[in-house]
Every structure is written in structure tokens, then in C-alpha cells.
Amino acid sequence: MIFKSEQYYTFLGFLAIIIWGTSAVFTRNLSVNIGAYTAAALVNLIGALVVIIRQLIKKEGLSNWRDVPRRYWIFCGLLFVIYTVTAYVSMSVVKTDEIVVVMVLIRFLWPLFTLVSTIPILKAKASPWLICSVFVCMAGIIIARLETGAFHLSYFFGRNLSGSDIVGYILSFIVAISWGIYTNLTRKYAANKNVDGVGVFMLATAVILGGVAFFVDEPRRFSINMTSQILYASIIVGAVANLFWNLSVKKGNMLLVVLIANFLPVISTVSTSLMLGVKITLPVIIGSLLVAIGTIWSKACFNTKEKSANAIKS
């Protein structure tokens, strides 16, 4: 019975990974058809209600909100808003779905940036090989954008570092960096405390972006399809996947789940390509594998105790 229970919770972890792998497609669709600010506000409003209601029912996560310093609410809240804005706006500025696939890969650099930012924030120690692992990940991003048969850096920089594409790339890097810093500040200020401010952060984000949406001209093409995608992004991705992940880490085979999670860049780029109808090219596969390998390598650059703690987060 124990074995079956562990299998069940491990399976929930796999489901969470699959759900996260599909999230970028819905962010893209909502940003283009509803508008980045309007969509982000609605998704976070619904998600916040789900999270906060659950916390109130279970009487956990908010009852001890005074136990964490004010800096947690200010800095982590600000980073959460930045992460959300850049995640949606980045998907709305690019013109082609092929660019979206590469941007998804960039966004999944967040485990790498989480590990790197532990050095200044949590005073973690890493070996010099960490620099090499970062270069491997960045090489993966560059290769993923090269077309088959066009493995030339001059071609890459000439074609991609201009216009709306470069804006999308920069915003995607901000998505990854902001989430990495957010993760470590949460750990610094709220570790071992029964406080979870995600619901509050989502609600604050919804209010701020909802206010911005009033002054921005956006398409707002609502339909049954778009409404269902809003519900999926807010409830399934925002609440259910996180719940599944937490349960799998606590009660499932954590090592197996975290191992599979390391390949989220591959899973997400493949699923995004399939859902958007974009051809899966060899450079994209090689690039996503390099990002996954670089991330795994970066974890090996920390000592065992730090590596185990960060593995749960990333």
C-alpha cells in the first residue's frame, strides 16, 4: 500500500511537469487574443481567489503573516509582478510562433538563475565549473534559434538581435532571472515559516495589471475558447500544478520527480512546438538538451547539502 501511495504521488509530480510544459502556449494565445495586461490580470485574479480560499479553509499560509519580515512582502511581491508582466508581454510582442519556442527555452533558464543567485543572496558556495555550465546553457539558446544548415553566429546575430524579437528575448531573460531571485528571497525571508504569500502576490498583480489594462488598447477578443484557456491558466497551471508538485515532493519519489523536472526545457519546447504547429527542428532539440544538461551540471557545482536544497526548488 505504501509503495502504491508513493507511486500515486510521484505520478502527480509528473502531471505537474506536463502541465507546466504546456503553460507557455496558453500565455501566448491569451496575450495575443485578449491582451497581455488584461489576460494576466484575469488569470491572476482567478488564481488568487483559488489559492486564498484554500488557505483560509485549511487555515494555513496566511494566519502567521506577521512572522515574516516586511521585506518579504515588498521585494517578493515586486518580483512576482515583474515576472508576470514580462511573461505575458514577451509573448505578445513577437510575431511568429517559431520565436515563441525559443523564448520558452529561455524562460526555463530559471532553475539555472535560481542556483546562480544563491551565491549573492544565500551565500552559497560553488565551484568554478559553474561558469562552464552557464555557457553550455547559453550555447543551447543560440543553437535553438539557428535554422537547420545555418550554424553561423553572424547569421544568428544579424537576423535575431533586431526588432521585436530582441525585445521578446530580453523580456524572457527577465522572466527567468526574476523568478530565480524570487525563489531565493522567499527561501531567505520565509524559510521554515508557515507563510505562503503567493495568493496575495497574485491578487496584488491582478489589481495592478488590471489598472494598467484600463489605459492600454488591447484586442480583448473574448470567446468560449479564450475563457476556457483563462480558467486553465489560472486554476490548472496556477493552483493545481503547484499543489501536485508540493504533494509529490513531500510524499512521492522526490529524486525521480526532480530528475524528470530537469528535462522541463525539452518537454516544454517539444510540447509547445506540437501545440503551436511549429516544426520541431534538430537545432531546437539540441538546444533544449544543452539547456537541460547545463542546468544539471550547474547543480553538481554546489556541495551536496546546498544541491539537495536547491533541487527541491528547481
Predicted stretch roles:
Residues 1-41, 47, 82, 86, ...:
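Glycine-/small-residue-enriched transmembrane alpha-helix faces in small-molecule transporters
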Residues 7-12, 37-54, 70-75, 132-139, ...:
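Hydrophobic alpha-helical transmembrane segments of multi-pass integral membrane proteins
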Residues 18-21, 25, 52, 77-81, ...:
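Hydrophobic/small/kink-forming positions within alpha-helical transmembrane segments
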Residues 23, 59-100, 143, 234-252:
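Specific transmembrane alpha-helical segments of multi-pass solute transporters/efflux pumps
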Residues 25-33, 62-63, 91-96, 145-164, ...:
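Membrane-interface helix termini and inter-helical loops of multi-pass transporters
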Residues 38-41, 45-49, 88-123, 254-273:
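Specific alpha-helical transmembrane segments that line the substrate/conduction pathway
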Residues 51, 126-149, 262, 271, ...:
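Hydrophobic transmembrane alpha-helices of multi-pass small-molecule transport proteins
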Residues 57-61, 299-311:
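Membrane-interface capping segments at transmembrane-helix boundaries
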